[in-house]
């Protein structure tokens, strides 16, 4: 064992990725659905590895440059993810959710700062408690930035000791921070005496929102494509345009005459024996089965090339409109809306689902219809797995330049720093690229690498570097005080957010369950809330708060450190 520990001490890259791998493995374990997750496991595993090393006389220490670089990549990735929704939060439809997402982080920060001062907790505790109680691991990074930026008076304590206290406080408060918000989002309606299931059902009926979580894979398709042989005298001799005028609910997508495929030209005259591929809603297809003639299994006529695309909603004329207003459009029967995403979060698709700018529509249909849909709704973004590294590089440079900007305030110079600058530049780049879609492509998988590897790697290094000093910081009295402050910071803000949303903003309780989860930037409670009410409605209240609170909580680790001392 001694030789293995010394080997790790001599090979820091192996040490780092061993810690990351073990953290991901440990993070997969759960008890009744509750587990640490990879990020929390990274700091636990990192501290454990460092403690084992110290027991054998080897003090592990990984490079500060690598730690900072990983964190900066993560911050830029966060900006890319939340950018469009963060901008969307400024519109009037989303303002209530944005307000709730501002209230919760501020309350959490205030409780942590006051609790630290009341109990006289050591440096580093405030940053760790904020990160753990709000389950925002990224706040560890901004807390560390407060130490490295030199804005704190360290006194006799070393940066390693402060990092150890950040890690310790995070670990003590994280478990209740995770479990508590899930329990609150599930049971706050019951505490208030509200039937959230009935509220969700009422919203579904009023807005046509299906329970997509339970939909699964079914054989039902609302749109259909069938082939008919022209034998009805009323249709023989009519042009395709005349047929469309008489039956606007159908779309002629192909005409086969003998060995020729004539396509859906409006001027084509239908002749006896032609085979017409007809598209439309299923109920319409079965209502007038003899309008052309008998149905035939003509594979050649039905062999219609289909297209798939992601359409970014940018057209002002369609934003704010519910989906039901498009039912009678020329696209009916030619495209199928498979999914709607807002800030990367899938939304339930219902007749009253209202489109917002920068929503992404995933459609499948006839090639001309998909192109037409792109013109109507905004911009077609063809799927690409290639990452625009040029934009990524210049986006990172922009972030570092923003971080250099400092303004005089309160007798000192204040700026966003590198981390804040990268977060802001990520928001700017993703907001612009989501509008144009001609540059800056960063597929979800690539962005996930920036976020996951960046944060897990950063937290692992924090744990490794702090672990040797961890045991010297730990006493029963300090641990109890940290837990109390973390418990209050995790529990009080969601209750106040719920009360404001329910009594003042009059938000539907099912939506408010998701909004409360979003205000804590945690998807787990929204998922559990959806299960609790048996509906997807809570997800509709989630995306805006998730984006806003995610940005605030990420940077509040810095302010917790500064304000608490």
Swiss-Prot record:
Localization, UniProt: Cell membrane
Coarse class of the protein's main subcellular location: membrane
Gene Ontology MF term list: monoatomic cation transmembrane transporter activity
The protein, known as: Uncharacterized transporter BB2657
GO cellular component: plasma membrane
Domain RCK C-terminal, chain residue ranges per copy: 210-295, 296-379
GO BP term, pick one: potassium ion transport
Bilayer-crossing regions: 4-26, 33-55, 68-90, 97-119, 162-184, 389-411, 415-432, 453-472, 482-504, 539-561
Native species: Bordetella bronchiseptica (strain ATCC BAA-588 / NCTC 13252 / RB50)
SUPFAM superfamilies the record matches: TrkA C-terminal domain-like (SSF116726)
Membrane topology: Multi-pass membrane protein
Recorded family membership: Belongs to the AAE transporter (TC 2.A.81) family.
NCBIfam families registered for this protein in UniProt: YidE_YbjL_dupl
Keyword annotations: Cell membrane, Membrane, Repeat, Transmembrane, Transmembrane helix, Transport
Keyword Cell membrane applies: yes
Pfam families, sorted: Asp-Al_Ex (PF06826), TrkA_C (PF02080)
Entry keyword Transport: yes
InterPro entries: AAE_transporter (IPR050144), RCK_C (IPR006037), RCK_C_sf (IPR036721), YidE_YbjL (IPR006512)
Domain of life: Bacteria
Xref: Gene3D superfamilies: Regulator of K+ conductance, C-terminal domain
């Amino acid at each position: 064992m001694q030789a293995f520990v010394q080997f790790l001490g001599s090979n820091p890259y192996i040490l780092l990725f061993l810690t990351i791998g073990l953290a991901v493995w440990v993070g997969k374990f759960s008890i009744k659905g509750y587990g640490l997750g990879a990020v929390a496991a990274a700091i636990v595993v990192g501290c454990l590895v460092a403690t084992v090393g110290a027991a054998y006389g080897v003090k592990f220490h990984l490079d500060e440059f690598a730690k900072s670089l990983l964190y900066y990549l993560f911050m830029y990735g966060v900006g890319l993810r939340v950018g469009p929704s963060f901008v969307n939060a400024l519109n009037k439809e989303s303002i209530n959710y944005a307000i709730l997402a501002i209230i919760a982080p501020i309350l959490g920060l205030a409780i942590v700062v006051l609790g630290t001062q009341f109990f006289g907790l050591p440096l580093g505790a405030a940053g760790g408690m904020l990160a753990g109680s709000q389950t925002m691991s990224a706040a560890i990074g901004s807390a560390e930035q407060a130490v490295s930026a030199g804005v704190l008076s360290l006194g006799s304590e070393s940066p390693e000791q402060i990092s150890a206290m950040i890690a310790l406080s995070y670990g003590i408060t994280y478990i209740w921070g995770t479990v508590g918000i899930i329990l609150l989002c599930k049971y706050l309606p019951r505490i208030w005496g509200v039937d959230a299931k009935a509220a969700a059902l009422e919203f579904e009926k009023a807005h046509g929102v299906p329970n997509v979580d339970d939909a699964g894979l079914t054989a039902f398709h609302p749109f259909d494509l069938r082939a008919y042989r022209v034998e009805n005298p009323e249709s023989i001799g009519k042009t395709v345009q005349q047929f469309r005028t008489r039956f606007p609910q159908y779309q002629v997508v192909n005409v086969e005459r003998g060995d020729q495929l004539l396509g859906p030209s409006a001027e084509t005259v239908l002749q006896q024996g032609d085979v017409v591929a007809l598209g439309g809603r299923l109920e319409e297809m079965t209502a007038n089965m003899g309008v052309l003639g008998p149905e035939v299994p003509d594979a050649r006529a039905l062999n219609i090339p289909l297209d798939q695309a992601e359409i970014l909603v940018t057209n002002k004329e369609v934003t704010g409109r519910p989906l039901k207003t498009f039912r009678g459009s020329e696209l009916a029967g030619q495209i199928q809306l498979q999914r709607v995403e807002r800030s990367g979060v899938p939304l339930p698709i219902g007749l009253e689902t209202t489109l917002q700018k920068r929503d992404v529509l995933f459609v499948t249909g006839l090639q001309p219809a998909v192109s037409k849909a792109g013109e109507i709704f905004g911009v077609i973004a063809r799927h690409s797995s290639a990452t625009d590294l040029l934009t990524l590089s210049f986006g990172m440079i922009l972030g570092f330049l923003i971080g250099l900007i400092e303004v005089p305030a309160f007798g000192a110079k204040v700026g966003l720093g590198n981390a804040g600058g990268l977060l802001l530049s990520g928001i700017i780049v993703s907001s612009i690229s989501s509008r144009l879609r001609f540059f800056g492509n960063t597929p979800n998988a690539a962005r996930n690498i920036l976020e996951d590897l960046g944060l897990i790697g950063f937290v692992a290094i924090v744990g490794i570097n702090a672990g040797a000093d961890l045991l010297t910081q730990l006493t029963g009295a300090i641990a109890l005080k940290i837990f109390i402050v973390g418990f209050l910071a995790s529990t009080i803000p969601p209750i106040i957010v719920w009360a404001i949303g329910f009594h003042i903003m009059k938000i539907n309780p099912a939506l408010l369950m998701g909004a409360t989860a979003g205000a804590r930037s945690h998807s787990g409670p929204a998922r559990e809330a959806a299960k609790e009410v048996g509906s997807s409605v809570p997800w509709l209240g989630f995306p805006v708060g998730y984006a806003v609170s995610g940005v605030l909580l990420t940077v509040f680790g810095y302010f917790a450190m500064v304000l608490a001392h």
